[in-house]
Amino acid sequence: MSNKLKFYLLSGPVLVSFIFALTSPIIQIYFVSRVSTEIFAAANMLSTGLAALVNSSVAVDRIMRWYKKHFYSIVIIDLLCFCIVSFLSTEYITVRFLGLAILNAVSTNLWCVLMRNAVNNIIKGDSLTKWESFESAWNLGGQFFGAALAIYFIDMPLELCIGLQCIANIIMGTTDYKAWDMLWKGKDAKL
């Protein structure tokens, strides 16, 4: 795996881990304190049910081929919907919980499954385990430093936190887009 590919595969997720750890305390406290128990429970149920359906569909070769063919569309739809849902949710709390439940279960889930599948296509066995551990360590490092800074940035405006999460997701979408090309079409591809 080339260093450029490693950079694309690591930089977006590490940035997302860092930004979400930095901003999530403010966002979660704000929204959880304003949502009803019924909406919260419905969002959990919706997310679980949809994720089960989506993950079941990945096992069907014909459907998985369709997902791979439409990877870019899945990422773009996920990014657009995440930003729309995130900003609408400041006025409509229910939109956040139900919208993100659907996104996390469907498009975000597919995005992650497809990226893992692409990496699994070029790395196998012990090398795959080492890569996944390396990737996890970097993501946890980003999360750790984001959480450490969150202790000091407790007064960030909600809109700034939401904006930072949207920007981090867009950057991750861009790096995954480039990594996808390298994994399936570039010199790192192993078909």
Where are the language model's segments positioned?
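Intracellular juxtamembrane helix-capping segments at the cytosolic ends
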Residues: I27, N109-I123
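Symmetry-related core transmembrane helices of the 12-TM Major Facilitator Superfamily/SLC fold
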Residues: E159-K178
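C-terminal ends and interior cores of transmembrane alpha-helices
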Residues: I76-Y92
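Glycine/proline-centered helix-kink
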Residues: S24-P25, L140-I151
